[in-house]
Amino acid sequence: WTDEKITALVRRIRAAYPDCAITLSIGEKSRQAYQAFFDAGADRYLLRHETADCAHYGKLHPPAQTLENRMRCLFDLKEIGYQTGAGMMIGAPYQTADTLASDFAFLAKLRPQMVGMGPFLPHRDTPFREFPAGSAEQTLYLLSLVRLMLPDALLPATTALGTLDGRGRQEGVLSGCNVVMPNLSPMAVR
C-alpha cells in the first residue's frame, strides 16, 4: 500500500465513522506521511520502540534500520498530535537489565499515551527461534512499573501474555493494564 492509498482509506473511514478513533500501526514512515494520515483523520499511531539501546537495536534489526530513525518517528508522531504508542517485548533476545533501564528512561521522556509490552515469543521461522520465551512474571512486574510511571496511559494486556499463561490477560489487568484485546478470529483462520 502506498501512503496515498492509506491516506485515502483513512479519509473514507473518517467520513463514514466521524466519532470513532482511527488507530494506525503501519511502521516507520516519513513525517510528511504521518502528517497526511493525521490530516485525513487518524488519531492514534502504534509504533513500538522495541529497545532504546542502540547496540541492542542493532542486534534485533537489519543494518538498514536504525534506532535513530525509530526515535525520530515516535517524536514526529507526538509533535503532530497523535495519541502515540510505544513499547517493547519483554525477554527479547539480548535484552538486559541495562537495556530495560534505557527503555524506561525513554518512556519517561516520550510519555506515550499507549505502551505495548508483552513477552517475547520465539517463532520457528525467524533467526531468534532458538531463544527462550520471555517471562510472564517479569512482564507483569514491568507492566505494573509502567502503570505507576504513566498512570493515564493505555496499557494493553497482550495476546502474547495470554499465550504464555492461560490467565495472563487477567493477571495483566490486575497488574495495571486497562485495555484487553480479545482475538475474535475463528480458530481455523488464526
What are these regions (language model features)?
Residues W1-K5, H61-N69, Q95-S102, E130-Q138:
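Alpha-helix N-cap and loop-to-helix initiation/capping positions
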Residues W1-D3, L9-L74, Q83-I90, Q113-G116:
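Core AdoMet radical
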Residues Q83, M88, D98-T99, L154:
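Conserved mixed alpha/beta catalytic, RNA-binding, or beta-rich assembly cores of soluble enzyme
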Residues A15-A16, A108-R190:
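Auxiliary Fe-S-binding modules of radical SAM enzymes
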Residues S30-D39, P93-A108, G162-S175:
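Catalytic cores of alpha/beta
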Residues I6-R11, Y34, M71-L74, F104-L107, ...:
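Generic structural signal for well-ordered alpha-helices
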